[in-house]
Regions:
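Generic alpha-helical segment signature
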Residues: 59, 75, 84-87, 106-109, ...
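Helicase motor core with emphasis on the C-terminal RecA-like subdomain
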Residues: 1-100
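Conserved small/polar residues in nucleotide/adenosyl-binding loops
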Residues: 181-186
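A conserved SF2-helicase RecA2
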Residues: 91-123
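Cys/His-rich short segments
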Residues: 125-162
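A general alpha-helix detector
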Residues: 50, 93-97, 112-116, 129, ...
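Positively charged, polyanion-binding regions of nucleic-acid-associated proteins
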Residues: 159-176
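Generic recognition of stable, solvent-exposed alpha-helical segments in well-folded globular domains
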Residues: 65, 108-111, 125, 160-164
Length: 186
């Protein structure tokens, strides 16, 4: 899709032979290509200071991993933007990979995933959360840099409205049809 839109991109993953991976890495470092679509293995050992974007298509397995991977962006002091796409099904998929591991390892893996999911779903300053996770404190309430600080979510109390909806569903014994009608704009 990227190449079809004239973006110079290349894949990088374990399924490629080492010569192809090496060529892709060199092309990226020498700026012959602009985008690498890669597994997490690509970022390890790459020291390219002017990376501007790190995009996760799946949720990372841990906050340590996320921090390491997103740390590739903006190393030169320029802007670095990190985007993580995340859905609950990602957690279920990662939990499934842990099923045949020893129980203690499963417990640790689940804890790491829960911490990563909490980070992804939180409305708290991301810098504050990461620093706290790594044992440091950040006294400011707003870093003026992360998505939560730049675009705070408005919170509303919806308990009463939700109770009305649940009572309505119970009243029709969950056997209903829904018709949505939106009147045309004048």
């Amino acid at each position: 899709v990227l190449q079809a839109n004239e973006i110079k991109a290349a894949p990088y993953h374990a399924g490629l032979d080492s010569a192809k991976r090496s060529q892709t890495q060199d092309d990226f470092l020498m700026e012959r290509i602009d985008v690498i679509v890669a597994t997490i293995a690509f970022g390890m050992g790459i020291d390219k200071p002017d990376v501007r974007f790190v995009i996760h298509y799946d949720i990372p397995k841990s906050l340590e991993g996320y921090y390491q991977e997103t740390g590739r962006a903006g190393r030169d002091g320029g802007e670095g933007i990190c985007i993580a796409f995340y859905a609950r099904k990602d957690l279920r998929k990662l939990e499934k990979f842990m099923e045949n591991k020893p129980v203690a390892e499963q417990d640790i893996g689940r804890q790491l995933l829960q911490e990563t999911a909490a980070y992804a779903e939180s409305s708290v300053c991301r810098r504050k959360m990461l620093l706290h996770y790594f044992g440091e404190e950040y006294s400011e309430e707003n870093c003026h840099n992360c998505d939560n600080c730049l675009h705070p979510t408005t919170k509303i109390e919806a308990k009463d409205a939700l109770l009305v909806v649940l009572q309505a569903v119970a009243a029709v014994k969950e056997n209903f049809r829904c018709l949505l009608y939106t009147s045309p704009s004048p």
